[in-house]
Structure formats: C-alpha cells, structure tokens
A protein has these predicted regions:
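Short, surface-exposed interaction loops/tails
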Residues: 113-189
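Small side chains
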Residues: 8, 20, 44, 120-123
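Alpha-helix exit/C-cap motif
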Residues: 42-70
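N-terminal single-pass transmembrane signal-anchor helix
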Residues: 1-21
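Aliphatic-rich helix starts adjacent to a transmembrane/signal segment
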Residues: 11, 20-41
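Acidic, glycine-rich loop-and-strand cores that form catalytic or ligand-binding grooves
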Residues: 61, 67-116
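Compositionally biased, intrinsically disordered low-complexity segments
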Residues: 8, 45, 67, 75, ...
Length: 189
C-alpha cells in the first residue's frame, strides 16, 4: 500500500516536472540559436568589412548576386538584399552549393568553433552597401527558404518577412539577428 502511494506521488511529480523541463530545454535551445545568430552576424560583418576595405568587394558582390536568392523581390526598398544559405551538414562536405561556398568563405575565418557551422544558416547581405542585413540560424530544420521559391521544402523553415517575429521564431527555435533590431531602437519621428 505504501509503495502505491509513493508511486502515485512520484507519478504526479514527474507529470509536473517533465513539461516544465521540456519547456526549459526548448527555450534554452532558442536562446542558444539566437546567440549563435548574433555571432554569425558579427563574423559576417567583419568579413564583409575586410572585403570592402581590401578592394575586392565588387567581385564578391557580383558572386553574391549570382549565387544568392533575392530576399525581398516585392519590396522596392530592399531589392538589393540577397540571401546566401548553408544547409545543415553542408559545411563538412568537400563540394558545397554555390551560396554555401560563399557562406563558408564569409564565416570560416572568424568562427573558431566550426561545429557552429553545422546548422541551417542564412546570411542576408545588402549588395549596395556591402553590409550584412540579417542572419538566421536553425538547428531543428533541414534548411531555410522563402515562400517565393519553388520546390519541395519538407523539413525546412520559411524565413519571409512576416515569419521573423519573436513568437514564431521561438516556436521553431530559429535564431535571428538583424540590423533592423540594432539600428531602430528609438523612433525619432
């Protein structure tokens, strides 16, 4: 009888603890991915600064335009922003996709923990200014895509403009860091 009471109490305690622990793990994965997105942002911006000051920015911008995907094709103000993506597991491969090779080139020198590059990464770069616009970092998906792209996107996360809010990204554990988040802290109108 006493064993049944103890087992009943343990079942109740586990019933309360397991969902809380699961939510904590989910939140910690999201925060880690957000932190990694910021790290990728800073590394990519450092690399782009090196290319701009080194005089080879025009060649890199042309490569980004040819290999990348236009992030906002319907927004006239953001026509010059192109996305470069690296799929999970692609970093360790000898041959990478065109934009995956560019992501590797931009991040490889400034990222010391190379295991961070084994994720779905998207760098959005403004080819007019030569600045990084935003970075997505996901470990719980097979890739990142835009809704205007054709193809099979099973297991991938959509990264359109309306999917960038905190709650949507938290549900998917998708890390994100953007110049809009850092530059527009105060409304000066």
């Amino acid at each position: 009888m006493e064993l049944m009471v103890v087992l009943g109490i343990m079942a109740i305690l586990f019933g309360i603890a397991i969902p809380g622990l699961s939510a904590y793990i989910h939140l910690s994965q999201f925060r880690r991915n957000d932190s990694y997105a910021k790290t990728m942002y800073l590394a990519a911006e450092s690399s782009l600064t090196y290319h701009r000051t080194g005089g080879d920015w025009e060649d890199l911008a042309l490569d980004i335009e040819q290999q990348g995907t236009q992030s906002f094709p319907d927004d006239d103000e953001k026509q010059s922003i192109y996305a470069l993506r690296l799929a999970p597991g692609e970093y360790g491969e000898e041959t990478k996709s065109g934009d995956g090779a560019l992501v590797t080139e931009l991040l490889d020198t400034d990222i010391y923990d190379k295991s961070m590059l084994d994720a779905a990464i998207c760098l959005e770069i403004d080819i007019t200014s030569g600045q990084i616009y935003s970075v997505f970092y996901g470990t719980n998906c097979d890739g990142l895509y835009y809704s205007h792209e054709n193809g099979d996107h099973v297991g991938q996360l959509c990264i359109d403009g309306d999917k960038r809010d905190y709650d949507t990204r938290k549900a998917e554990r998708l890390g994100y860091y953007s110049v809009e988040d850092t530059a527009n802290l105060a409304d000066l109108k």
